Amino acid sequence: MAESDSDRAPAPRFLVVDRKVPEPIRQLLEEADGCLNMSFTVGGTACVRRAIRKAFEIENVEDDDFSASLVALGQKHPSVAPTLFQVMDLLGSGEDALQTDALNALIATFKGVLYEIYVLGEERLESLAYLSELLQALDRDNTPAKQPKARAGSPSIKSRG
């Protein structure tokens, strides 16, 4: 059987959980992935849901209501696409074990959210901090002043004599 290009393509970067993600969440996701790989959907579902709850706790958005916690997490991190939280709510809020494809989707979606929060969010903050330092270091006396542009069609001031 021939191997397709999609079989050899590297996994998207967000699927590899970065070291910036808190260790307790990473450990639970590793367990969820291991269970998924062995088709232990009950264990995998429990682990990913525990990982999500741990994220709520770490992010200080924990509520008894799973959906309310997701809303709070989305409000805390508005740069994360709301659709990701909707998928997590749909798949993660129940008590029953998920089927393999749904479990895979929940794990991948949660990894995407974690990537947005802990990797891209951190990179954005680092970029902004660097740019802020550069701007503060500018010597305003050596920065050319911006001259106002004359508007086309504006009346000119003539001296009266």
Predicted regions: what they are:
Residues F66-R160:
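Long, charged low-complexity segments
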Residues I25, G44, V48, I52, ...:
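Short runs of predominantly hydrophobic/aromatic residues within well-ordered alpha helices
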Residues M1-T41, P144-G161:
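Charged alpha-helical initiation segments
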Residues N37-F40, F56, N60, Y115-Y118, ...:
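Hydrophobic/aromatic-lined pockets within catalytic cores
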Residues P12-D18, L36, A55, G74-V80, ...:
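A ubiquitous short alpha-helical element
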